[in-house]
Amino acid sequence: MIAFQAENLIENGTKRLFNFIFTSHLQMMDENGNMTKTEISTHKLEQCNISHFNEFDEASTYNVVIYYNHQKLLKDQLNDYYCLPLNYSLQIQGTQKSNIFQYGKISVTICSSDDCYSTDEIQQFQRLGYFNNSFKINTLMLNRVPNLNIPNNYISYIYSDYYIQAKIGQEIKTDVYLEQQQLSIEKSVIPGIKVLEQDHVFSIMENKLQASSVFTSNITRVASFFIRLSQSETHYYKEYYRFDELFSYVGGITQFLATILGYFILRYNQTGLQIKLANSLYQFDMPEKQKGQMVFSFQLLVNKIFESLKSIEDAVQKFKNSAHRIINLTRLAGGLKFINQQSYQNDDIDDEIVNHLATQQVPQTDKLKVEKCADHCHESNQTFYLQQDKKKFLSLIVQLILESRKKLSFGVHFLAKQVSGSFKKNTAVNYQSQLFEKSRKMILRDMDILVIMNKLQEIEKIKHVIFNKTQRKVFNYLQKPVVCVKKKINQDKYDQSLIHGDLKNKRDDTLRLTMSSKSLLGIRQKYNTEKKFNKLYEAYEELALAEDPNETEKIMNQRLLKLVEPTIQYSFNSLVEIEKLSRQLRYNKKKRVETQVLKPHNFKLGSSNEVEEEIENNFDIESITLNGQKKDNLYKKSQPSLPENKIKNLTTLQSSTRQLKDVQLNQIQSKQDFLDVEIISS
C-alpha cells in the first residue's frame, strides 16, 4: 500500500492545488516490432482513511510506534494523503522490451475541478511568485517483507516514507519497482511425505527509488510515478527438520563432541595407563617433606632397615651369650661328676675325705643334674624362640620394604598440577611430574615388543639350562630401578659400624638409572607381595647355607645372591645369621647326646687347657657381620679357666699338702648367668 501527499504552496489556501490520477497502461509489440500503447483505465486517487491501512492493526507491523498510535497518524496525516481506490487490484507485467508490458502511472498535476483553484487564480499565483519555490511530494508506504521465522504469519510489514523535491515548470519522474517474493514452506516432518505451502507477495524496492527531472512548458504536469514490475525475484524456502535429518544432526553433533572429548579421554587413559605401568615396573624415590626438609623415600627406607638390623644384632648377641653360659654349665657339671667318680676309686684316700666328699657331692650332683636338665629345656626353648624371632624380623623387614614402595598417584590433583605447571612459570618444583616424564620415557624405550619377546625367549632357555629350581627362584627376583628427580641422590653418612664400603658401592650402582636385560624378566601383574618375599627368603637362605662341594655351583650361588637388591640382601644376611645360630644349637644338642652315649665310664677329666679347647671346639659359633664376614673377637668373651676356679683332678688332690675341706656351688637366681664355683680349702 502506498499513499501520496504534496505540500501546499499557497499559504492560507482554501482549495486544492494538486490532483493525483492513476492511469493503467498496456504496451504491446507485434512480430514486426511495431509498438502500440493503450490506456486501459484511469482513476483518481481518493483521500486515505483507516480502511486503506488496515494492516496497521496487525501485530506483525515492525514500526511499533505507528501501530500503537495509528489513531493519531490517521487524524494528523492520512487526511492529507491520497490512496488508490479500495479493493482495486493493480496489474503489472513485463518489461520495457517485452512483448507485453503493463504498468501503472500516478500523475501529479495542477487540478482544474470545482474544488480547485481556477485558471485565473493560478496565473495570479504565478505572477506573485508562489511557483518559484520548490516543494515536497511525500509518499507513505507500508511495505511487505517475508519473514519465515514467524510461526503463524510469514509476512511482516515495514512502514517507510519517500519524498521528492518538485518545482512548477519541471516534471519529476520516478520508477517504483515492485519485486515478487516467492515463498515455499515444507511442513512435513516425516521422511517421504511432502506438504508444500506456496505464496507470493510484492514488495517495493526502496533501493531503486531514483528521481529524475525533466523541464516542460506545461506547468500543469508536476511529477509522475511509474509503478512497474521488477526484473528480479526473490525466493524464500523453509522446511522443518524431519526425523531423519534431526537424527543425522544430533548424530553429527554427538560425533563432533565425541571426537573432541575422545581426544582428551584418550590422553587421560594413556596417561593413567602409563602411570599404572610405571608403578608396576619401577620404584620411585619420592620426596617427602618432614620438619621443613625434603627427604627422599629411599633414604628413609635405608634408615629404617638399619634400625631393624641393630635389634637383630642385639638378639643374636643375646643368644650367643646364653649359649656360652649353657655350655660352661654343662662342662662344669661334668667335671665335678668325674672328680667324684675318681675319688671313690682310689683306696688311699682318707676315709674321712671320702665320707666328706660322698656326703657333700651327692646332693650337689643331684642339684647339678636338675639344673642341667632345666638348662637343656631352656636351650630347647631358646631354639624355638630363635625361630620365632627370625620370622618376626623377616615379617618386619618385608613390611618396611612394602610400605616404602611409593607410587605415582593419578587423579584430579595430578591433572591440576600438570595444567597449572604448563601455564605458570617460576612455580614450585613438581617432583611427581618430573618422575612421571622420566618413567614415561623409560617405558617407551623399554616396551619394544620385539625386543621383549626375543629376550624373554633367550633368557628362559638359559635359565632352565643353567639353574636348578631353587636357583631360579632367586634369579627370578627383580629389583626395580629407582626413578630419581636428580641425576644423583644426595647420600647422607650413616653409622660406619653398620655400613661398609661394599654396601655404599652397591647402593650407588643401584641408584643409577640403568636398565639391564634382567629388568624385562618375570611376571609383573603382582610384583612384590609378602608371600613372594617369604619365598624369596627361603630360596636365599637355602643358597646361602648350602654346602655344595662343587666349586662352580658355589660361585654361581654367590653371584646370584649378589644380584639381590642391597637393602634386601643385607636384611636377609642378618636372618641367615640367626638361622646359623639355630642350626648350631641343634647340632650341639645332638652332639652332646651322642657324646654322653659313647663316652666311657673311666673317662678322666683332662687339664684345664684341654677342657677349654673342647668347649671352643664343640661350640664354634662364628660371629658374622651383615656383609657375611667374620668379626674378629667381636663377641668372644674369655671364659674363666678351670684352674682359676680351683678345680683339680684326682692326682692334684692327692699330691696337695692341703686337705679338701668343703665344696660349695652357689647358683645365681637367673638361669642366664654363670654358676660361680667356690672351692674352700684349708
Swiss-Prot record:
It comes from the Eukaryota. Glycans are attached at residues 12, 34, 49, 87, 132, 218, 269, 328, 381, 468, 550, 649. GO terms for cellular component: membrane; nucleus. Its main location: membrane. It is a single-pass membrane protein. Keywords: Glycoprotein, Membrane, Transmembrane, Transmembrane helix. It is found in: Membrane. GO terms for biological process: reciprocal meiotic recombination. The chain crosses the membrane at residues 246-266. The keyword Oxidoreductase does not apply. This is Uncharacterized 80 kDa protein. The lineage of its organism: Eukaryota, Sar, Alveolata, Ciliophora, Intramacronucleata.
